[in-house]
């Protein structure tokens, strides 16, 4: 099928308005959230499940490479094309217009269509006293429920593990190149044909008596037990864990998801955030061991930051912090799209500095007063390592008692209970940390190389959780920034190297060090185009997509 005929066929399905082909208009969708970009013949926006099905049918018939895309919040370039040297036309299928969420069993589960976001689910569930899998970070920037499932998204919450379900509806291209619809939703009376199934789902009415599949998992229900195993010789969670790879779950877009069925969670009646500081890594090891061994209630979350990322996020993540606090989360995805389009246009003007919007936002944020509360800043000055420990209900008293009577007796440690302002600021600051390294590098392009970001899962029994890099690496480093999900032993490590450093050589050395520790990577960001998939993932991807049609 010729390119003009392909574009015409796609437009006939979704309307010309929803088929983008101009470079300027597709720039945002062809680029990654942090990095990465490539070429595409078209970006298509179906509005219904049937339109999505027909678009994919057209692409399969035309022998296109299909990239399934949602809100493009992935951090490893997996939601955009990689380069401009594909051997066939690339079509990006963006499913953000298909956003229905259906409550099941009084809200204990939901059925989500592919474009439905975690933020929308959070708002829908709040009156019912329930919450989605993730409630910070991914919800803030508009990530979809399906995207989380497809990438084993971990999130910050200690009780929930990776996003996971065994109940899904998806399109799959078999070894003969035929597109098939696989219905494993566990719901009766949806119909037999794609048209019938899609129509019944989009009506949004599913009686409880039609629900089956109760023997299948709609979340990682065993995670609370796994995280407590302090002798574990495997990480608690990581992207290539064979126990968490199942059809759409962990598929990374190698099938086309049309709907997933997932569990929801009760909202705690009370929450309290504690800020902890120490200059010795072993003090936090003692805390982790005690909490996971003795507490009846697991923490809601326990987020780690080192001083380097605290300082960098304070300065270079300030605009993100202020945007979320004062503009809210709903406008952020659109704001990112506008920023990306502006960058694409401005970067084509030779005499202008690259990433001009980043420069503007950085200097604009500097006009605002200090955004972090005084007690957080005092801890930054006193300590090298920080934990943001969030407890709920009975766990609040457990934590308070342990911190006051035992942990605080350790030499050189301290903690305080956050008030509401401090709690909000601490969590927003931790979220703003995720983009701080990129912003720093964008503003220091003449003296630094691109950011090397590693997403790491340490073994459950690893006590040496603070990295000690050899001189052959540190002599080339400008900044080493560490943050992550401490109880889960999942860490995000952003390295900014001096100009002229061989980044690939540095990455190989670091990965060899991690391999020697038995660590797994990536932990929760998926391989995208930035990591090599191990044999477990490769075999899984090949079983899902033997013709390599999806998400190159």
At which residue positions do the language-model features occur?
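N-terminal flexible segment immediately upstream of the FAD-binding catalytic core
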Residues: 1-60, 74-110, 262, 309-317, ...
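Anion (oxyanion) recognition and catalysis
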Residues: 60, 126, 515
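FAD-binding subdomain of flavoenzyme oxidoreductases
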Residues: 114, 119, 126-285
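C-terminal cap/substrate-recognition region of VAO/PCMH-type FAD-linked oxidoreductases
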Residues: 246, 256, 261, 272-283, ...
């Amino acid at each position: 099928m010729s390119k003009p005929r392909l574009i015409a066929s796609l437009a006939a399905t979704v309307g010309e308005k929803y088929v983008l082909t101009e470079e300027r208009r597709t720039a945002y969708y062809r680029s990654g959230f942090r990095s990465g970009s490539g070429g595409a013949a078209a970006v298509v926006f179906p509005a219904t499940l049937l339109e999505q099905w027909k678009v994919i049918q057209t692409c399969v018939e035309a022998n296109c490479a299909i990239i399934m895309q949602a809100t493009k919040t992935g951090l490893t370039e997996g939601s955009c094309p990689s380069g401009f040297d594909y051997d066939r036309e690339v079509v990006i299928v963006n499913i953000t217009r298909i956003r229905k969420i259906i409550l099941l069993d009084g809200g204990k589960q939901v059925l989500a269509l592919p474009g439905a976001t975690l933020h929308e689910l959070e708002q829908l569930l709040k009156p019912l006293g329930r919450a989605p899998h993730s409630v910070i970070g991914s919800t803030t920037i508009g990530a979809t429920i399906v995207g989380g499932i497809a990438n084993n998204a971990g999130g910050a919450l200690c009780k929930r593990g990776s996003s996971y379900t065994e109940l899904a509806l998806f399109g799959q291209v078999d070894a003969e190149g035929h597109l098939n619809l696989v219905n494993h939703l566990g719901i009766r009376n949806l119909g037999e044909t794609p048209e019938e199934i899609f129509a019944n789902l989009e009506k949004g009415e599913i009686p409880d008596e039609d629900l089956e599949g109760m023997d299948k998992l709609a979340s990682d229900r065993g995670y609370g037990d796994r995280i407590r195993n302090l002798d574990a010789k495997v990480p608690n969670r990581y992207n290539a864990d064979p126990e968490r790879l199942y059809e759409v779950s962990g598929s990374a877009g190698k099938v086309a998801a049309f709907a997933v069925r997932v569990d929801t969670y009760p909202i705690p009646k009370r929450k309290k955030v504690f800020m902890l500081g120490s200059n010795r890594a072993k003090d936090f090891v003692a805390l982790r061991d005690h909490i996971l061994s003795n507490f009846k209630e697991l923490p809601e979350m326990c987020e780690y930051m080192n001083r380097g990322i605290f300082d960098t996020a304070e300065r270079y993540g300030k605009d993100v912090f202020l945007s979320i606090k004062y503009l809210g989360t709903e406008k952020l995805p659109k704001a990112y799209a506008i920023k990306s389009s502006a960058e694409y246009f401005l970067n084509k003007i030779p005499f202008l500095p690259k990433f001009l919007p980043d420069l503007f936002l950085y200097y604009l944020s500097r006009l605002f007063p200090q955004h972090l509360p005084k007690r957080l800043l005092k801890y930054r000055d006193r300590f090298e390592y920080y934990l943001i420990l969030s407890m709920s209900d009975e766990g609040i008293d457990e934590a308070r008692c342990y911190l006051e009577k035992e942990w605080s007796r350790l030499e050189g440690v301290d903690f305080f209970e956050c008030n509401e302002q401090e709690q909000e600021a601490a969590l927003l600051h931790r979220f703003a940390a995720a983009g701080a390294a990129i912003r720093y590098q964008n503003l220091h392009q003449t003296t630094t190389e691109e950011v090397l970001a590693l997403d790491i899962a340490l073994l459950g029994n690893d006590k040496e959780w603070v990295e000690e890099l050899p001189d052959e690496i540190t002599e080339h480093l400008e900044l080493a920034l560490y943050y992550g999900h401490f109880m889960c032993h999942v860490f995000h490590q952003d390295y900014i190297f001096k100009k002229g450093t061989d980044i690939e050589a540095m990455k190989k050395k670091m990965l060899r060090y991690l391999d020697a520790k038995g660590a797994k990577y990536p932990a929760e960001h998926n391989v995208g185009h930035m990591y090599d998939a191990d044999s477990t993932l490769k075999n899984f991807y090949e079983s899902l997509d033997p013709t390599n049609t999806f998400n190159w």
